[in-house]
């Protein structure tokens, strides 16, 4: 009879002291800047907020999904508000410009949250891309 050779690395690993659905933050801590640009991209499905320095280098970004919202709740105004608060608190901005893109429901809520956070806003720009009769839009959905 042959002896069975014990496996060195088994597939089952025992994790001590961990909850089953524990989430861990793998992000590095964001750089602290005093002046920057806040980009708000509000689509119909999500709200993404990116904070950059004046040269355009990304310092921190946040979205409704990374704040813990799932599926259709990512498109809500409350998700946009929480995303904006999360991004500004992490970076610690004092003065900023705001660039708003898109027509989603989180757009106005994110803008209100940025204004109430105590950041001095130098300008608010709407940079939503508007065609000057360029490409033909996709056909309308029929439900």
Curated annotation (Swiss-Prot):
Single GO biological process annotation from the record: translation
Subunit field text: Part of the 30S ribosomal subunit.
UniProt GO MF annotations: rRNA binding; structural constituent of ribosome
InterPro entries assigned: Ribosomal_uS11 (IPR001971), Ribosomal_uS11_CS (IPR018102), Ribosomal_uS11_sf (IPR036967)
A Pfam family the protein falls into: Ribosomal_S11
Matching PANTHER family: 40S RIBOSOMAL PROTEIN S14/30S RIBOSOMAL PROTEIN S11 (PTHR11759)
Entry-linked HAMAP family: Ribosomal_uS11
The organism of origin for this protein: Cenchrus americanus
Chief place of localization: plastid
Subcellular compartments: Plastid, Chloroplast
NCBIfam families: PRK05309.1
Protein family: Belongs to the universal ribosomal protein uS11 family.
Keyword annotations of the record: Chloroplast, Plastid, Ribonucleoprotein, Ribosomal protein, RNA-binding, rRNA-binding
Protein name (Swiss-Prot/TrEMBL): Small ribosomal subunit protein uS11c
Gene Ontology CC terms: chloroplast; ribonucleoprotein complex; ribosome
Domain of life: Eukaryota
